[in-house]
Every structure is written in structure tokens, then in C-alpha cells.
Amino acid sequence: MENTVVIKCGGSVLDELSPAFFASVKTMREQGMNVVIVHGGGPEIGKMLKQLNVRSEFVNGLRKTTKEVLAVVEMVLSGKVNKQLVTMFKQHGLPAVGISGVDGGLLEAEPIDGIKLGYVGRVTAVRVDLLQTLLAANYIPVISPLGVGRSGQTYNINADTAAGAIAAAIGANQLAFVTNVPGLLQDGTLIGEATAETVEQLLKDGVITGGMIPKVKAALSALSDALPKVMIVSGKTPFYEQGTWHGTTIRKEVGAYL
């Protein structure tokens, strides 16, 4: 879909989204863009698991998802975080509809590794027609990253990779990862623009660390001929003003422009 932007909001930044974030989304819509939101919820899931005394562990950066963990993930992502985010959009005058990847079979999924990761899935198909229906009705879809297998089994999907899969499926011309920092930083200084090759080297050199690693890897994997650039932006300050993006632009290659 032309003029479509997929924005992924990490769970750690949801409580810090400023009025400037919503103003940026509003600006996009005023300029005729379709906006799709995908959100995480890791911190809230972690809190609830602790409260309910449900054991959880991470394997290669992904939360191993047993049946007990999956029940909590569903409850927190779709029941709490999704509705809170939809309410925030409404408070800023933006029409949003909360939807899980399970609803309407929006995100079809399969297990990545049932033995090591349990019910953690990868997206295999996206119901593009469902998103098109919501966008045509002038809504902002706010998607919690759960998927459903062909047998009806629900899967926990990493929000970064879900956003990339959705962007590719609907033919978005922009994908942005919203964080609590201005973008990629090197020695405290914002990297305004970098090629995929440069970013891969920064990963190898240990310049990119912690929670930024999965976001950057998802950004790199989302790059394609159809989506030659991806943004990493802040949710605390305006990230889009008067047609200009603020943050780090990762390009597939030198000179790759939309």
C-alpha cells in the first residue's frame, strides 16, 4: 500500500510516549499517510509473571513461552497494553482500533523451535485485506504481536519481527522502530544515517548493545528492494515534522532512496 508507515513501539517506551509522538502520527495522517502500530510489552509481561510466580527464561533473546507463560503474555499484551495504547491515541484525537494478531487470523504463525522456545512463533502470512479494511475506514490499527497457527494454536511473536513482516506484507514504504533514545548512538552522538553494512559492523564492534540489538537486527532483516530504508526514532520527541524524519536512517546501501 502506498503512503503506509508501520511504527513499532517497544514495551519499554510505552510509558514514555510524549505528546510529541502523537503529534508526529497526526502530522503523518494529515499528509495522507496510513499508519499501522505494532507494540511490545516485555516489561509488563515480566511484572505479571513475577506477580503470578510463573517462571520464565530467555533463549537467544526470546522469551521461552510455555503454556503458563503464553496465558500471561496474551492477557498482558491484548488485554492490558493494547487497550492502554488505544486509549492514549484516543486521548490525542486519533482514531485507533486495538487488534491482536489472532483476531481474524491477522498473523498466521508457526513455531520457531518448539523444544527450545515453546510457543514462540514466526509470522508466515498476514491478512492484508483486514488491515486494508481498517485503514480504508480511517482507523489506525494497533496490533499486539500474537499469531495463530493453522491448527488454531496461539503463538507469542517478537514485536520487532512482527512489525517487519507486516511492513513487507502490506508494501509499506516506511518502517520505524520507536525507542526511548534519539536513535543509534556512538559515543553519545546520534548517528543520523548509516548503511546496513556499517550498522552490521557496529554490532560486531559492540557499539550497539542491550535492548537495541534486537531492534537493529529486525531493522536490518526488514530492509529490501521494496523497503530500502528503516528508521530508529525516539518516542519522547517529535520524530516526524514537515516531511522530515528525526532519528537514525538505516539504508540498504549507499544512495538507496524511496
From Swiss-Prot:
- GO CC, alphabetical: cytoplasm
Q: SUPFAM superfamilies per the record?
A: Carbamate kinase-like
CDD domains hit by this protein: AAK_NAGK-like
Q: Is Membrane a UniProt keyword of this protein?
A: no
Q: Does the keyword 4Fe-4S apply?
A: no
Signal peptide interval: none
Record-annotated residues binding substrate?
G41, G42, R63, N156
Q: What does this protein do?
A: Catalyzes the ATP-dependent phosphorylation of N-acetyl-L-glutamate.
EC number(s) on record? 2.7.2.8
Site feature Transition state stabilizer, where: K8, K215
Keywords recorded for this protein, A-Z: Amino-acid biosynthesis, Arginine biosynthesis, ATP-binding, Cytoplasm, Kinase, Nucleotide-binding, Transferase
Instruction: List where in the cell it is found.
Output: Cytoplasm
Catalytic activity, per the record? Answer: N-acetyl-L-glutamate + ATP = N-acetyl-L-glutamyl 5-phosphate + ADP
Q: Could you tell me which species this protein originates from?
A: Geobacillus thermodenitrificans (strain NG80-2)
Where in this chain does the entry annotate a coiled-coil region?
Answer: none
Pathway noted in the entry: Amino-acid biosynthesis; L-arginine biosynthesis; N(2)-acetyl-L-ornithine from L-glutamate: step 2/4
Official protein name in the record? Acetylglutamate kinase
Q: Name one GO biological process term.
A: L-arginine biosynthetic process
Q: Which InterPro entries match?
A: AceGlu_kinase-like_sf, AcgluKinase_fam, ArgB, Asp/Glu/Uridylate_kinase, Glu/AcGlu_kinase
A GO MF term: acetylglutamate kinase activity
Q: Which NCBIfam families match?
A: argB
The entry assigns this protein to a family as follows: Belongs to the acetylglutamate kinase family. ArgB subfamily.
